[in-house]
């Protein structure tokens, strides 16, 4: 897995521009709704990343659609194309459950993986580009950032690509997560993290261990792509996101200690927000248009008070929008799908392919194809998908098909469902399971049901009837017709 070399976001933008993957917009455009409209049209057309150099009312440029195509996601992960992301998945599968070499030849085969591990430790700097300019106290003013308002009924401007850095009271390793943050004042944001996410868990542990004490938080905007993508990739719990970013980039992740707390942030990030969450300080968040294509309901979340803003000279504000797919998170989902496959295959070798259709909000429906080996096998795989990786705990529907079905072709999948399923026998319903807070279709917020569809051929024990034989063309006839096809001139 040879990494494409770039040091920070600016290096990456130079690389994109050289390849025609970045467009500079010099015309003044408003971060209030207008940037979303332009970015949405561009993404749907498979267009470039956009750097808005003159956002109306602001001196700071806005970067959008950075990961607007699977190719750019792959480039951000240091790869030439999406197919190479399977190698990233294989590396993660290896790191999740490393196996010692079985001999010299196996050691030689695994040597590239062992060499990559050398890039895992972070490199701590004394000073960093992200601290070239410092604002603190009354000089902190979040309204100077060109924070986008994406949809007409959004409650307020929303930070969308903030890389939130936290650490629990009993942990050495930090957690990196991406949580949206509503702007509610010059130095106030609402931190919308769900209770199972790493940042929220760190906060709950802090409240239990240090009741009444302020919880330190830092947020990085415009980190290098490998670090951003490390925060949204299924990294094993034993591996930090910074370490994984080093593997992707091929060089150690450079970090620097914050000015007001002990958290370490990406040294090359464009902007850093430092501050704290006061225990008990909450505020109503939303509504916001989100990746489901709907506005979500209002709910209370902790308030993040910003005490320091540090940034690079001529900083760039990195942003995105979320809406009904396709949007940038959906594109990320398509690319990261290739990372998931080898991880699942290591645990379940019978899996041939795994697909999260973007139109299913990238995680709410999964199609699995497998080499079925015994009666009930499909149901075992369903349960495995729901339980093996926490990324799939919110997947509402799992469709399991045989390996003669293309998981990424709805024509194939629908054919399998309608010809190989009996609804009563082959549907599995599981009640009272964790469900995405944003899923308003569930009867209770955060709790709902799941459905598994066994669209495989049925084995003895699963049916008492003779099973249908698929129609297969005669290969000799096919070859004869191939030989005379042009002569027939049917389409000429």
From Swiss-Prot:
**How does the UniProt record describe the way this protein sits in the membrane?**
Peripheral membrane protein
- Which GO molecular-function terms appear in the entry? 3-octaprenyl-4-hydroxybenzoate carboxy-lyase activity; metal ion binding
**Which residue positions are annotated as catalytic?**
290
Q: What does the entry list as the binding residues for Mn(2+)?
A: 175, 241
As given in the record, the signal peptide range reads none
From the Swiss-Prot or TrEMBL record, state where the protein is found: Cell membrane
Q: What is its EC number?
A: 4.1.1.98
Gene3D superfamilies documented for this protein: Single helix bin, UbiD C-terminal domain-like
Its protein name is 3-octaprenyl-4-hydroxybenzoate carboxy-lyase
């Amino acid at each position: 897995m040879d990494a494409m070399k770039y040091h920070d976001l600016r290096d990456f933008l130079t690389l994109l521009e050289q390849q025609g993957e970045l467009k500079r917009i010099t015309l003044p455009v408003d971060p209030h709704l207008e940037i979303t409209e332009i970015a949405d049209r561009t993404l749907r057309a498979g267009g470039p990343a956009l750097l808005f150099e003159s956002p109306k009312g602001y001196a700071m440029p806005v970067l959008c659609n950075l990961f607007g195509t699977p190719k750019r996601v792959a480039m951000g992960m240091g790869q030439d194309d999406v197919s190479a992301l399977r190698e990233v998945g294989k590396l993660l599968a290896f790191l999740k459950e490393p196996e010692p070499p079985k001999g010299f030849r196996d050691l030689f085969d695994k040597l590239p993986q062992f060499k990559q591990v050398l890039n895992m430790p972070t490199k701590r700097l004394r000073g960093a580009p992200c601290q070239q300019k410092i604002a603190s106290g009354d000089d902190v003013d979040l309204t100077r950032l060109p924070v986008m308002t994406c949809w007409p009924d959004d409650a307020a401007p929303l930070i969308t690509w903030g890389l939130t850095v936290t650490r629990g009271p009993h942990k050495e390793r930090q957690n990196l997560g991406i949580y949206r943050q509503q702007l509610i004042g010059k130095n106030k944001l609402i931190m919308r993290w769900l209770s199972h996410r790493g940042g929220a868990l760190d906060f709950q542990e802090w409240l239990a261990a240090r009741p009444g004490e302020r919880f330190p938080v830092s947020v990085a905007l415009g980190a290098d792509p490998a670090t951003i993508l490390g925060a949204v990739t299924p990294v094993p719990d034993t591996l930090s996101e910074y370490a994984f970013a080093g593997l992707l980039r091929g060089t150690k992740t450079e970090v620097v200690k914050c000015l007001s707390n002990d958290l370490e942030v990406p040294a090359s990030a464009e902007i850093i927000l430092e501050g704290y969450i006061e225990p008990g300080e909450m505020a109503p968040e939303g509504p916001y248009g989100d990746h489901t294509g709907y506005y979500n309901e209002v709910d209370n979340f902790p308030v993040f008070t910003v005490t320091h803003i540090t940034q690079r000279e001529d900083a760039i504000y990195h942003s995105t929008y979320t809406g009904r797919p396709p949007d940038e998170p959906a594109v990320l989902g398509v690319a990261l799908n290739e990372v998931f496959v080898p991880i699942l295959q290591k645990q379940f070798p019978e899996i041939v392919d795994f697909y999260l259709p973007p139109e299913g909000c990238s995680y709410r429906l999964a199609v699995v194809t497998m080499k079925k080996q015994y009666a009930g096998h499909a149901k075992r795989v369903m349960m495995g998908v729901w339980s093996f990786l926490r990324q799939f705990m919110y997947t509402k529907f799992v469709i399991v098909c045989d390996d003669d079905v293309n998981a990424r072709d709805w024509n194939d999948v629908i054919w399998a469902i309608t010809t190989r399923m009996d609804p009563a026998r082959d549907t599995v319903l599981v009640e009272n399971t964790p469900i995405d807070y944003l899923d308003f279709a569930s009867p209770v917020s955060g709790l709902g049901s799941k459905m598994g569809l066994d669209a495989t051929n049925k084995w003895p024990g699963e049916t008492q009837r003779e099973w249908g034989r698929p129609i297969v063309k005669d290969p000799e006839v096919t070859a004869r017709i191939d030989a005379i096809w042009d002569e027939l001139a049917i389409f000429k």
